[in-house]
Every structure is written in structure tokens, then in C-alpha cells.
């Protein structure tokens, strides 16, 4: 879809200074941040507390709780520090959510997302037709 991305590996616990420095350096340069984290999963919340850039939290399955610990850490944010959170290990939905947020600013992206949804709907209809022909 032509969306420019920056990928970093940083930790809210192990590299907090570098994380905050990076967030400060991209202020005004990016439209949305996707923050993937497992276990305690404080990364999206720390980022959201450090910037007004929208943050999409992506919980990762990485512990004995199958990612539920990560998910709950992200959705239980305190009032005033929101993190838009998708389902566990759902990188595609995180990207689509980020694109939807960006589509407010970029009309071409909105059209691309409409086309994507139309293609998904058509696939369901094609699958329905195909299975009924097999019966």
C-alpha cells in the first residue's frame, strides 16, 4: 500500500531511555505507532504516555498465559492514556488499524482500504458459491 515504515526493537523495561529518546525524535514525523509486546507488555502504554501520536498495541503470545497477560496489560490503560489494542498476534489487524487512522490524512489509503474490504467480501461470496456447487 506504499506506507512507509520504521522498525525498531526497544524495551520499556530494558532500554527506557532509548525508547523515550526515539519517541521524542519521531514526534511530528510519523502518523501512528504500532507497539508489539509480550508478557507484562508495558511498551505501548509507555509510548502512549510519552506522545500524542496514536498508538496501536499488538499483544504477543510469549508466556504461559498464551498472550492474555499482554492483552490485558494493553487494554487496561488508565484514563487519559489510550492505546488502541488488537487481538493477540494479530499483526495484520494492527497494520490495518494504523492504515485506517492514517486514511484520515491520506485519501488514497482510504480508497485502498475500501478495495481491500471489497476483495475480502468477494472472496467470501466466491467461497460460498464454490461450496454450494460441490454439494
Whereabouts are the PLM-identified features?
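Short glycine/serine/threonine-rich phosphate/pyrophosphate-binding segments
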Residues: 15-17, 37-46, 65-68, 91-95
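Glycine-rich phosphate/diphosphate-binding loop of Rossmann-like nucleotide-binding domains
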Residues: 1-14
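Short beta->alpha connector loops at strand-helix junctions that form conserved
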Residues: 9, 58-61, 84-87
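C-terminal binding/interaction regions
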Residues: 5-6, 68-135
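Glycine/small-residue-rich loop that forms an oxyanion/phosphate-binding "nest" at active or ligand-binding sites
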Residues: 50-79
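Structured helix-beta-strand junction loops
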Residues: 1, 28-29, 81
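Structural motif
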Residues: 12-24
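Glycine-rich phosphate-binding loop
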Residues: 22-59
Amino acid at each position: 500500500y506504499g506506507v512507509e515504515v520504521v522498525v525498531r526493537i526497544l524495551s520499556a523495561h530494558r532500554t527506557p531511555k532509548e525508547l523515550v529518546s526515539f519517541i521524542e525524535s519521531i514526534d511530528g514525523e510519523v502518523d501512528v505507532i504500532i507497539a508489539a509486546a509480550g508478557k507484562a507488555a508495558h511498551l505501548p502504554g509507555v509510548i502512549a504516555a510519552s506522545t500524542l501520536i496514536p498508538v496501536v498495541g499488538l499483544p504477543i503470545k510469549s508466556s504461559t498465559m498464551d498472550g492474555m497477560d499482554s492483552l490485558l496489560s494493553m487494554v487496561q490503560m488508565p484514563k487519559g492514556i489510550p492505546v488502541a489494542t488488537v487481538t493477540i498476534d494479530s499483526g495484520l489487524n494492527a497494520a490495518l488499524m494504523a492504515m485506517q487512522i492514517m486514511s484520515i490524512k491520506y485519501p488514497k489509503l482510504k480508497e485502498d482500504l475500501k478495495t481491500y474490504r471489497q476483495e475480502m467480501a468477494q472472496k467470501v461470496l466466491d467461497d460460498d458459491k464454490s461450496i454450494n456447487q460441490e454439494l
